[in-house]
């Protein structure tokens, strides 16, 4: 992850809006969970949605300003301000790890340690989303430092001895789906991962 805290980027993350695709994903994959970890929780954007679906919600992020904002949502039982690779020494295991738009911020050398730590923390499911680098929006944020193809990342995830992962599309964001001329594109983006601007890697525990 980039060294230090970029305060302009922090401000941008504080201004982010809820993505309905993520709320629907939480409703589907977190519902009924005893506990969930919001990995790279940022400002707590999805804390309330996680709280509606899980009995216990904890978060971890490395940015102190974002952690304070997440705490202010009141959705989390606990927030830890630390790199995600330290989750094992900071928090108890959870049923589900929700990891939305985090991995792209890690350099290649940080990816496996972070994944190992998060997988060790999850007893049942890993719910990971990342931008599809075939789309321009994935390149607009200078902190998106991980270079990956969708197939390469799936293979990297499936090096795990704990989880088996599948790659799934999420479709277009709501503000694009409302445009009539995007409807055929959304139909493709909901069926085929390579056509989806954001993709899901869903991990089920196997060992």
Residue ranges and their predicted role:
Residues 1-92, 96-98, 109-116, 169-171, ...:
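Conserved N-terminal segment of class I S-adenosyl-L-methionine
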Residues 46-47, 134-139, 175-176:
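Short catalytic/ligand-binding loop motif for oxyanion handling, primarily in non-cytosolic enzymes
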Residues 100-105:
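Short catalytic micro-motifs in class I SAM-dependent methyltransferases
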Residues 112-126:
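A short glycine-rich, Lys/Arg-flanked "PGG" loop and its adjoining helix->strand segment in the class I
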Residues 128-130:
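Acidic carboxylate diad motif detector
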Residues 137-152, 156:
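Acceptor-substrate binding/catalytic loop of class I
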Residues 154-172:
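A SAM-dependent methyltransferase catalytic signature shared across enzymes that methylate proteins
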Residues 166-207:
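A C-terminal cap/extension of S-adenosyl-L-methionine-dependent methyltransferases
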């Amino acid at each position: 992850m980039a060294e230090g805290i970029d305060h302009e980027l922090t401000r941008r993350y504080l201004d982010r809006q809820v993505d309905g695709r993520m709320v629907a994903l939480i409703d589907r994959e977190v519902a009924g969970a005893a506990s969930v970890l919001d990995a790279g929780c940022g400002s707590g954007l999805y804390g309330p949605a996680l709280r509606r679906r899980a009995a216990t919600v904890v978060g971890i992020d490395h940015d102190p300003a974002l952690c304070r904002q997440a705490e202010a949502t009141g959705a989390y039982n606990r927030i830890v301000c630390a790199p995600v690779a330290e989750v094992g020494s900071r928090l108890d295991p959870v049923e589900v790890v929700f990891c939305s738009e985090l991995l792209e911020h890690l350099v290649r050398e940080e990816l496996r340690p972070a994944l190992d730590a998060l997988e060790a923390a999850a007893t049942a499911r890993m719910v990971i989303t990342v931008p599809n680098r075939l789309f321009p929006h994935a390149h607009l944020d200078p902190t998106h430092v991980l270079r990956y193809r969708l197939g390469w990342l799936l293979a990297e995830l499936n090096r795990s001895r704990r989880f088996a992962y599948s790659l799934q599309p999420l479709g277009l964001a709501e503000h694009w789906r409302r445009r009539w001329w995007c409807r055929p594109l959304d139909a493709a983006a909901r069926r085929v991962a390579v056509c989806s601007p954001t993709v899901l890697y869903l991990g089920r525990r196997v060992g």
